[in-house]
Amino acid sequence: MIIDTTEIETINSFSKLESLKEVYGIIWMLVPIVTLVLGITIGVLVIVWLEREISAGIQQRIGPEYAGPLGILQALADGTKLLLKENLIPSTGDTRLFSIGPSIAVISIFLSYSVIPFGDHLVLADLSIGVFFWIAISSIAPVGLLMSGYGSNNKYSFLGGLRAAAQSISYEIPLALCVLSISLLSNSSSTVDIVEAQSKYGFWGWNLWRQPIGFIVFLISSLAECERLPFDLPEAEEELVAGYQTEYSGIKFGLFYIASYLNLLVSSLFVTVLYLGGWNLSIPYIFVPELFGINKGGKVFGTLIGIFITLAKTYLFLFIPIATRWTLPRLRMDQLLNLGWKFLLPISLGNLLLTTSSQLLSL
């Protein structure tokens, strides 16, 4: 059987087109992921700068001012310094657990960003169980901290890892119950559906007004999950040197530093999505495109406005955990566990029962 050379060339050209389509498909799949990672990195740098400026204002001192204009590049300078430092590994510790622990903590928090909607149809993965995916993924981070503490072969590190695990278990349950109440109100566990359910009723439709008790419990539980003062017992300097971070240096120590701010940012974003209306401005009589004389059909402008509103609400809310760090003293371990199990858990259960009853009566 003789095959014409033109037929062979045609077949080869089709195979090349198919391979090019596959390459373009992979590139288009990676573009939103890379964009999200870059955006998160910039967001974390902004949080570090904001925290230093706000804490300097609270303490009536001058914050960073030499690294770039207004000290905005100070976080970048600190990160570069950590990259250049020596990466020490304890000789008597478990090398694999010691090395894997920080990566697990960072990756698990990074995955949480995939279900956060930054605007209308601007979410990496609109899952039907989005909020519970976040809770499930965030519960993996303490496992990484426990591995780091155990792998360090240091009593202070191990005790810090145990505290992190105990604290996470104590406050995950009230947090999950508050999220379940929001899901019942919105008739969905998708983050996009929850935002759209709030937008139906405008500013007064925010879950902040419909779930004030749940909001307070969620706020306290998220602070505990982020290990921020007054809940920073896993790394209490006066008791545990630096907790599970004691034996770390260089880039691995930097990963823990990044993980804490990533967790703070993702918690604030979920407060915005669950309680503050997400990307919707929700102010009566004001529609942003009309305010600037732009047609409602401008999708690009609408997307940018949605991102801006989401981030504005998030960074305004961030003032609360930052100010709390420099205002309240650290709790004792027994006080922390009592607060979680004896107060927040019954309150969140009662809030869930009230929400369920109101939803049943409204049927």
Curated annotation (Swiss-Prot):
The keyword GTP-binding does not apply. Keywords: Chloroplast, Membrane, NAD, NADP, Plastid, Plastoquinone, Quinone, Thylakoid, Translocase, Transmembrane, Transmembrane helix. InterPro entries: NADH_UbQ_OxRdtase_su1/FPO, NADH_UbQ_OxRdtase_su1_CS. GO terms for molecular function: NADH dehydrogenase activity; oxidoreductase activity, acting on NAD(P)H, quinone or similar compound as acceptor; quinone binding. Its EC number is 7.1.1.-. It is a multi-pass membrane protein. One of its GO terms (biological process) is aerobic respiration. It holds the Pfam family NADHdh. GO terms for cellular component: chloroplast thylakoid membrane. Its main location: plastid. NDH is composed of at least 16 different subunits, 5 of which are encoded in the nucleus. Belongs to the complex I subunit 1 family. This is NAD(P)H-quinone oxidoreductase subunit 1, chloroplastic. It comes from Solanum bulbocastanum (Wild potato).
